[in-house]
Amino acid sequence: MGDFILRGWNWCRRFRHRCGYGVHSPSDFFFITFVIYERLPFYAYAPLHHLRRVVAFLPHYREKVDKFLFRLINHLRPSVVWEVGTGSGISTRYMAEANTGMQVYTFSEQSEDAVKRILSGKSSIDYLTGNCEADMDRLLKKGVKPEVVHIAHTPAYKEMFERLIPLADKHTCFIIGNPYATPEKKRWWKEVIADPRTGITFDLYDVGLVFFDKERVKEHRIVNFL
């Protein structure tokens, strides 16, 4: 009940930030209107919906957010995604289904049998457990560099951001999971928005998006996605 009331309060606060109102950049308006707010029933939504209950006891986003991650990957078309903090693995599946030509490397401190079950059906997903920094170093030595980074269900979000931001270029997108989860993370998210190393940022409440195209004027977009 507390979360429901909080979301209602934040929805009211973000009311004027809905549907791209006040956004003058054509590319940002397109992104908000046709990626964030797209309502078409994509082909993968139905089978993925039935997988959710298998891993519902593990950390996960709302289904609405996972559908957005599907659309985001479908829009960006990266060849490599790195995800730190697998959680339930359901977001991993949504992203993998959006672009069958890419490889997803998802890093988790420990292995979960239920997560293995829902990820094993996709050869494009590597579920890496244990020392994630060692796995990252190994991938980088092989020339495997992420175009999308999902900092998801991990308490080491600050460390992972600093570890991975040197890999970012104008084509990179960072997805920050649950930026309002705690007061400390909320303060850190504000620092990320103001960081001179980052470019355009989007705040959807459940997730934040960070882009790094320094040719564009740095702006922050709040989107009512509650």
Predicted features and spans:
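A short alpha-helical cap/connector motif
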Residues: 1-150, 154-170, 180-226
